[in-house]
A protein has these predicted regions:
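Conserved NAD+-utilizing ADP-ribose enzyme module
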Residues: 1-78
Length: 78
């Protein structure tokens, strides 16, 4: 599973949902799907795919300012 993050700070693309905090991280099933989404939005300079390993999830939680246990995920398209 992959997330898309900003190259500048590593913050993931999230879906805003009323009453849900932190916002769910949007996920793609594989790297090629994430890269295709980035390319479709002409976002190659700003974004990169990130494989959701345990270490990557710890870093995402730190970037988002929340415990890893409170993170939720929303598959694309959702």
């Amino acid at each position: 599973m992959y997330a898309i993050v900003y190259k500048s700070d590593g913050f993931p693309v999230c879906r805003q949902m009323p009453g849900v905090s932190p916002d769910p991280v949007v996920t793609w099933m594989n790297e090629s799907a994430a890269k295709a989404f980035i390319a479709s939005k002409a976002g190659d300079a700003e974004f990169q795919p990130l494989e959701l390993t345990d270490d990557a999830m710890d870093k995402l939680a730190k970037t988002m300012g929340c415990p890893v246990q409170s993170m939720t995920f929303e598959p694309y398209p959702g």
